[in-house]
Amino acid sequence: MVDANAFIDEAIADIKLKVGNGKALIALSGGVDSSVCAILAHRALGDRLIPVYVDTGLMRKGETDRIREIFKFMNPHVVDASDRFFNALKGVTDPEAKRKIVGEMFIRVFEDVVKGLEVDFLIQGTIYPDRIESEGGIKSHHNVGGLPSVTEFKGIIEPLQDLYKDEVREVARALPLPEEISERMPFPGPGLSVRVIGEVTREKIAVVREANAIVEQELVHQFKPWQCLAALLEKGTGVKGDNRCHGWIIAVRAVESRDAMTANHMELPWETLNKISSRITSEIPSVARVVYDITPKPPATIEFE
């Protein structure tokens, strides 16, 4: 396990050394990884840190307002780039291609933000499992294998690249960060795009965003999963009232894990699963069916794409 206090001192010193008298951009997402990086970088660089949150249109319900509130002391740049992301993802169905497109779009948006500001470095919250999955060919993470090979930044700084998620949480507690951040569930960098099987559209994202909100409301506080989510699969036949319908299929997933390298499904009570199914199909009229995924990792990954 990591010595959190020693790590904090070393990370701050390393950021100072690498950036020197220059400036750096920190990519905020609201998750524990980027939040820890943001605090470390802010302590190292102060006003020479440019915090940026990109609203991709692929985020969780209420996420942008939450970011504004939590990081208001940093006065972050909030960029609505949703049109750019949806346009770039139009017609794309391959999961790996989606991840690479999202990674490239993030970099291009960051480059636009810092034009004329003489910012040489990008700081991001890559952690060890991200590197393992990307380098091992399992899936490209938007902040590793999904990054373009050519960028305007002179260097990318990844203070957490050798830490597992549970170690990042230890650092978060030592900083200290509020529990709502230090204990927050992982959320994929490419956002809800990897919870939509096939082409990403605004309609599909709206459906899966509401479904994810319901799943989190029903599971997070009571059962404390490592991660829980809803993914949109395809359409299937259902019945609404006395009429046949052709609606979306939503897959619910909740897992237990320590480091995200392996995971097992949570054995949730039937009444909880029934409530989730009932809420999703009644509150989202375009959904016809809800299923629960019990596949461990391996052979499955935690996310669907």
From Swiss-Prot:
Stored InterPro entries: GMP_synth_C, GMP_synthase_B, GMPS_ATP_PPase_dom, Rossmann-like_a/b/a_fold
Catalytic activity, as annotated: XMP + L-glutamine + ATP + H2O = GMP + L-glutamate + AMP + diphosphate + 2 H(+)
Alphabetically ordered keywords of this record: ATP-binding, GMP biosynthesis, Ligase, Nucleotide-binding, Purine biosynthesis
Lineage: superkingdom: Archaea
The EC number(s) this enzyme carries: 6.3.5.2
Domain GMPS ATP-PPase: 2-184
Keyword set includes Nucleotide-binding: yes
Residues that, per the record, bind ATP: 29-35
Family annotation (Pfam families): GMP_synt_C
Cellular component GO terms held in the UniProt record: cytosol
Keyword ATP-binding: yes
Pathway: Purine metabolism; GMP biosynthesis; GMP from XMP (L-Gln route): step 1/1
SUPFAM superfamilies (alphabetical): Adenine nucleotide alpha hydrolases-like (SSF52402), GMP synthetase C-terminal dimerisation domain (SSF54810)
Molecular function terms from GO: ATP binding; GMP synthase activity
Assembly and oligomerization: Heterodimer composed of a glutamine amidotransferase subunit (A) and a GMP-binding subunit (B).
Function (record text): Catalyzes the synthesis of GMP from XMP.
NCBIfam families on file: guaA_Cterm
Protein's recorded name: GMP synthase [glutamine-hydrolyzing] subunit B
Organism: Methanocella arvoryzae (strain DSM 22066 / NBRC 105507 / MRE50)
